[in-house]
Amino acid sequence: MSDTLTKEAPAGTPEGAIKGGIVAYLSVEGAIRCGDFYKKAFAAQPVHINPPDEQGRTMHVHLLINGNSVMLSDPYPEHGCPYVPAAGFSLMLPVANVDSWWQRAVDAGCTATMQPQDMFWGDRYAQAKDPFGVTWACVGPKKA
């Protein structure tokens, strides 16, 4: 692997730079609505939102969730990017307080799929599915 790859953005990187290692780029129906929902459910901070096109779609929404970038786009089937429902993955959200993050997500409209609980591997863990079909896994330290 190259020595030039780094997790953190280099010093002097402009505001709005991508934060984190691997960044999820989700194709959802209603990317701007999804971004608004993530503000409520996951305390997302908008970094950049491309204006919608004449059909109400946007090609790019950049958010920060818990200090890391998450990106969204509407499907553009005419450009080879059709809508495909989320399946076979979850977004892991490492947090200090699993219960409060999970509860905020559920209160905002996520479906509870696994209540917060202390797991055999040593973490506290919970899951919820958002209205756009994405499963979120909150993980953090066990309750004291």
Predicted regions and their residues:
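Vicinal oxygen chelate
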Residues: S2-S27, G35-P131, C138-A144
